[in-house]
Amino acid sequence: MKNWKKIMAGLCAAAMVSSMVPVWAAEETTEEAADDGDVADVSEAMLGLWKDSAGDIYGFYKDNSFFGQWKDEEQDVLGVYALSSDGEYTALVMQFANDDGTYDDENMVTYLVQANEEENLLELYDPDSLDLTATLEPYEADGDESDYNQTYQDMGDILTECYSGETEAGETFIYAANDDGTFCSVLVIDQDDNYVSFVGEGTFDEENGTVTITDEVSEMALTFGVTLNDDDTLTLDMGDLGSATVQEATLAVAVQGLKYAVENGTEMN
């Protein structure tokens, strides 16, 4: 569980994105360049799951969060990314979370990125030499039941919000949902990597102010009330099951959380 805690670094990471614009872009971007469609075009093209020649997997999500699965290092990383343009080049800045969940400039990398629409590739170039550094192609599931990457990616495409925190008992609690709350995901994982998950349809009871999530596999349901606190955190009251206090996190946290639990934990429901 300690390793999981280290990489639970998506909390409020979206606030970092605005400060990640490269210096050269911040200084040289003109009003015309700011209106250029390159950034928007690249941003839309790169959403999804990609794989490079080394087998590393890159997941880019709509809230500017990032989830990397490094094959050689046998580890997963969370981070945030930002795109900017000087009118000629589009820069991709990727900032990875440190082991303690913090962010700093030392754990950051910048590429020039180009979407090769004809071949459906993402090309990453060195910003100084302009040499091609990596070519990313869309990830394709291999059909193996143990390959959950496409399932996680599909979930990431649906979700639009994520909240993460802890229960009263100190368990990690992750709640995510789509725009209208009709698809939700809840993951609760304890210090021994035992976990309970609910992934499926969500319904909101306006009269009682409760959310009910019915797992599409087990058909078990979880109901909790939602209270907004003064510090912008949420308290989720599950009745006899206790409560959890959560705050806004990135979509990558929801995706990685479920992946971690399935691959490393023991399912309890």
Q: Locations of the language-model features?
A:
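N-terminal glycine/threonine-rich, aromatic-flanked beta-hairpin/loop signature
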Residues: D52-G101, E168-T210
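Sec-dependent signal peptide cleavage junction
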Residues: S18-G37
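An anionic, turn-rich surface loop/hairpin at beta-sheet edges
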Residues: T90-V113, G209-L228
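Short, exposed beta-strand-loop hairpins at the edges of beta-sheets
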Residues: L121-L132, L234-G242
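Tryptophan-anchored aromatic micro-motifs
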Residues: E32-D56, D147-F173, L258-N269
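C-terminal partner/receptor-binding element of secreted or periplasmic proteins
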Residues: L132-N149, S243-M268
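N-terminal secretory signal peptides that target proteins for export/translocation
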Residues: M1-N3
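Sec-dependent N-terminal signal peptides
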Residues: K5-A15
